Amino acid sequence: VVHTVTSPESGLHAAGEDAIRLARELVRRDSTNHGGGQGDERAAAEYAAEALGEAGLDPLVLESAPRRANVVVRVPGTDPSASALLVHGHLDVVAADAADWTLPPFAGEIADCPVTGVPALWGRGTVDMKNTVAMVAAVVRHWSRHGLRPRRDLVLAFVADEEDSAAYGADWLAREHADLFEGCSVGIGEGGGETVHARGTDGRPVRLYPVGAAERGSAWLTLRARGTAGHGSRPPRDNAVGALADAVARVGRHAWPSHLTPVTLDAIDAVAKALGVERSPGDTATDEAVDALVARLGEAAPLIAPAVRNSATPTMLSAGYKVNVVPGEATAGVDGRVLPGAEAAFESTMDALTGGRVDWEYAHRSPAVSAPVDGAAFAAIGAALRAHDPDAHVVPMCLSGGTDAKVFSRLGIDCYGFSPMSQPEGLDYSALLHGVDERVPLDGLRFGVRVLDTFLRS
């Protein structure tokens, strides 16, 4: 007999402890992605597959290249007419230098957080994003123990290479194994669902839960200037280094105009309403007015600020091989981020900023994506959060960076950033992303398990 009622709280408590154990073991399996194809997710993938196998599932471990492993499994639902839901997360992590950490980054130790005093799991990947992989696995293991099933099919995809190009992970799966995602219309992954503490205009505490509903596109650019090579004592008029330096300086100084997408406008409205910030028709009339409005959102301003305009950040320079030799070519790398609908404006602006002496081209490009915030999926996310935090204010968000949602969106899947995690006040959770002493509160994992259980069976 399949029971579809809410599982006993005692069972979910055990699932929360299971998530903590699974997360510790995943952290202990070093899956550092060094970039450029240098990574090894195999041990983490095998452990995740073993955990899912213990729930009666038959996961596939798929290698796109030696040791670049991905795990995919379908969890059958009770309603074959319902579209499937994709739940994606990545197994790779960024590098960590143990000398900089208070506790070893791959030991999976539990210790109190020095900021909040609450017990936390420390280690690389506890925030990004082995925590979510562990929570999802714990939920389906809980279902197996209690005879529970979701209403719709779930496709779980724990992938490689998100921290670099996705070439060995989501991108490879979407190209070579698209059939595994058949029937998926909605997906959830990283990029939202964590508590953001703020204060209303009257001083009352407000708990916001931003949910990713859009992502700026990635536009990694190579700028190239060419000139006459020669001796440093006889400088040419067309010095490539000087031309490139001028262009890079213009790019770095440029004040990009505001470009408010529907998701960002919805986010501003939702945050302002939650905080009691009054709005007026002129709030978005000019760039200055937009910036002033965002500033009035106080602690919530960082949720909105990166999503109101395009950006282009110079990050790399390369020229020459010897100080007394004028190089014939100089290059720069620029990290561009482009809002939905602002691609043409971005390109024309880069043309103007680089000028006639410097060419630019895309080194890597992934378009911006967005998903509906007025449909059943976003409503179900909000309902699940409010079921376990009645005072939750769920707000849409446009992510400043990017996730594997960009890849899975190509398959026609509406993707949301939803990795639920309660956070104590005073902890800057987002600052721990890729940071030293990355850690997640144990109660945050327990909360996430409860919310995911509700959402994934809704």
Label the model's feature ranges.
Residues 2-6, 193-214, 218-447, 453, ...:
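Metal-dependent amide/peptide-bond hydrolase catalytic core
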Residues 119-134, 163, 238, 439-446:
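Short, conserved micro-motifs enriched in small and acidic residues
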Residues 2-98, 329, 333, 343-347:
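N-terminal helical capping/dimerization or prosegment-like subdomains
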Residues 130-148, 164-175, 240-246, 250:
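Active-site-proximal alpha-helical scaffold in enzymes
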Residues 151-159, 185-188, 263-265:
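Beta-strand segments within the central parallel beta-sheet cores of soluble alpha/beta enzyme folds
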Residues 91-93, 157-166, 190-195, 229, ...:
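Acidic, glycine-rich active-site loops and adjacent beta-strand->loop/helix elements
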Residues 175-193:
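A glycine-rich helix N-cap at a beta->alpha junction
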Residues 82-155:
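Active-site metal-coordination/substrate-binding segment of hydrolases
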